[in-house]
A protein has these predicted regions:
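Feature captures the catalytic cores and cofactor-binding loops of soluble hydro-lyases/lyases
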Residues: 4-12, 21-132
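Internal active-site segments that recognize and position negatively charged phosphoryl groups
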Residues: 17
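Phosphate/diphosphate-binding glycine-rich loops and adjacent basic-rich segments that engage nucleotide
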Residues: 133-145
Length: 145
């Protein structure tokens, strides 16, 4: 197994690891994710029926209403939140949801902003391990050698 690393901007501190789940389009957690199961339920989303639980969730940006923060926090409360969230564009709704989940439920889901040129390489990894502290996030990519 080979390991590489990518640096990113930390938006929410924490550490998490999981297989990457790359979403081709932004996802609204309010109405697009079942917080009880972690299932993507948006019937128009290309990754409908994917499970976010325990995954390194990669999405270009969030989409939707401010209620998405509550839906994301609820998924963490019920134990089906992602292990980490990687974005290309800043999204305050995603950040607030992860911060609320950390404060209320002790969920340490890091959220990081990655550079678009790193996106494909991250998505192709077998597993991603994210550690976010301060403003710096380090993402270790594990791939089969």
């Amino acid at each position: 197994m080979s390991v590489a690393a990518v640096e990113a901007l930390a938006l929410v501190p924490g550490a998490g690891a999981g297989a990457p789940l790359r979403l081709d389009e932004p996802l609204s957690f309010w109405g697009g994710l079942d917080p009880a199961s972690g299932l993507v339920t948006d019937r128009w989303h290309p990754q409908r029926n994917a499970i976010v639980a325990g995954r390194a969730l990669m999405m270009p940006a969030g989409r939707g209403s401010s209620s998405g923060s509550a839906a994301l926090a609820e998924a963490f409360r019920l134990g089906v939140g992602p292990a980490a969230i990687l974005l290309i564009e800043r999204d305050p709704i995603v950040v607030v949801g992860a911060l609320v989940a950390a404060a209320l439920y002790g969920a340490a889901c890091p959220v990081a902003l990655v550079a678009a040129p790193d996106w494909e390489r991250l998505a192709a990894a077998r597993r991603l391990a994210i550690e976010a502290k301060g403003t710096r996030a380090m993402i270790r990519l594990e791939r089969a050698s």
